[in-house]
Amino acid sequence: MKSVRYLIGLFAFIACYYLLPISTRLLWQPDETRYAEISREMLASGDWIVPHLLGLRYFEKPIAGYWINSIGQWLFGANNFGVRAGVIFATLLTAALVTWFTLRLWRDKRLALLAAVIYLSLFIVYAIGTYAVLDPFIAFWLVAGMCSFWLAMQAQTWKGKSAGFLLLGITCGMGVMTKGFLALAVPVLSVLPWVATQKRWKDLFIYGWLAVISCVLTVLPWGLAIAQREPDFWHYFFWVEHIQRFAMDDAQHRAPFWYYLPVIIAGSLPWLGLLPGALYAGWKNRKHSATVYLLSWTIMPLLFFSVAKGKLPTYILSCFAPLAMLMAHYALLAAKNNPLALRINGWINIAFGVTGIIATFVVSPWGPMNTPVWQTFESYKVFCAWSIFSLWAFFGWYTLTNVEKTWSFAALCPLGLALLVGFSIPDRVMEGKHPQFFVEMTQESLQPSRYILTDSVGVAAGLAWSLQRDDIIMYRQTGELKYGLNYPDAKGRFVSGDEFANWLNQHRQEGIITLVLSVDRNEDINSLAIPPADAIDRQERLVLIQYRPK
């Protein structure tokens, strides 16, 4: 009966966090709008080999993540939930692997369920796991690889070992097809410390080639297909997207070595109080084979991405699966022996909630700021934000009422965030970061436009997805579309600022021409170097400028 209650509670938890509130949040640009539009175009064109964005070749990532996103929109439609369905599914599958692997290591159903709940309620997992990017997919394949390698090394027969290594190769291959060759580097680095400490080199060398073969066979069909269709894909993807992006001096998203320290701290909420103890207990029990394995999968990817010059918070998502397992194991031990860490965790959540309440007041219309985040007419959004932090503090307090029994309710601290964050986004943020909001406000003007030009790739993708058209033209800036725009068949998809006046004269009689420009909040749009327009509609950070036929 208790198991049934636990399962009902888990399904309710998943529904409240990962299903019900997702449609209430508009898509963010540039990431969500980009991946939404790539998948929409894949469905519309039927081309499942070469990824395109705005009708242009887009070689930033391989294909597998787009496949999953496309299936999400195919099943649930071109809406907010459909766009995010793939990442939610991948996150829930990862949690299922966490449950299964924890159960296999410790043979404790309660511990296994707790590990999954901790994983799903971690701030970084929830933030990225409900956000339409490719990182939840690669995290799933890496965690699947973690489980596969353990299965292979624990098997007692050659058939079991062979099956485990073949499965490992498939997960690595799918990882390569999702985000590239990092899906090979991370597993190798993660298993080496365990293999060294356990002296299991023999099994690795005897059976490892099976993983190599299955990985190659997994990637080969699509790899050959895209090489035939687009011979320069692999050169661009390997050299630009891997070497330049991560290792060279001009790497994208450069950050210092310690960049991930605050990410780990913030990402571990609402379980931050367990982080030091879980890592220390793991190190203290390093003679235990499973503990060393989980520690290695937590720390080695973190060190690898810290050394790389290019960094983003999403890169270390896979580290939190083994970390959640270590946290769950440590939490149960602490509840039995010394609940100090659980009390500290409760106080951290109270402090975070109270700090959020105060910060919300400071940036509200009634606070001391001259330019508040929310305007007076957005009072309900301020109250939503207060509710988010109030619930966080409340559940933090509740975990302290009988800490040995109630500590696990920390999983409900982000409940207000899950349910209300979509209703608390300030208009000033929505106007710049949510193209759907802009389209909603300007739908009647945008719909009949013969040509639409914009100076932002993220906005262009949002316009294309919302309006169901892929012919948006880039104006002044090429951004990440620079490579695709260099192809001969992309001629006419970019108009520079100097060319715009002549281009306008040539195309004006074909129909309404609309410019959508990103501007600074205090920028005078009359100072823009453009021909006089027939209509201007400013929505704070985005401006719609129209030219009608003469």
Curated annotation (Swiss-Prot):
Its EC number is 2.4.2.43. It catalyses: 4-amino-4-deoxy-alpha-L-arabinopyranosyl di-trans,octa-cis-undecaprenyl phosphate + lipid IVA = lipid IIA + di-trans,octa-cis-undecaprenyl phosphate. GO terms for cellular component: plasma membrane. The chain crosses the membrane at residues 7-27, 81-101, 113-133, 134-154, 165-185, 204-224, 263-283, 288-308, 315-335, 346-366, 382-402, 406-426. Pfam families: PMT (PF02366). Keywords: Cell inner membrane, Cell membrane, Glycosyltransferase, Lipid A biosynthesis, Lipid biosynthesis, Lipid metabolism, Lipopolysaccharide biosynthesis, Membrane, Transferase, Transmembrane, Transmembrane helix. Pathway: Lipopolysaccharide metabolism; 4-amino-4-deoxy-beta-L-arabinose-lipid A biosynthesis. It comes from the Bacteria. It is a multi-pass membrane protein. The keyword Lipid metabolism applies. GO terms for molecular function: 4-amino-4-deoxy-L-arabinose transferase activity; mannosyltransferase activity. It is an enzyme of class 2 (transferase). PANTHER family: MANNOSYLTRANSFERASE YKCB-RELATED, UNDECAPRENYL PHOSPHATE-ALPHA-4-AMINO-4-DEOXY-L-ARABINOSE ARABINOSYL TRANSFERASE. Belongs to the glycosyltransferase 83 family. NCBIfam families: PRK13279.1 (NF009784). Catalyzes the transfer of the L-Ara4N moiety of the glycolipid undecaprenyl phosphate-alpha-L-Ara4N to lipid A. The modified arabinose is attached to lipid A and is required for resistance to polymyxin and cationic antimicrobial peptides. This is Undecaprenyl phosphate-alpha-4-amino-4-deoxy-L-arabinose arabinosyl transferase. It comes from Escherichia coli O17:K52:H18 (strain UMN026 / ExPEC).
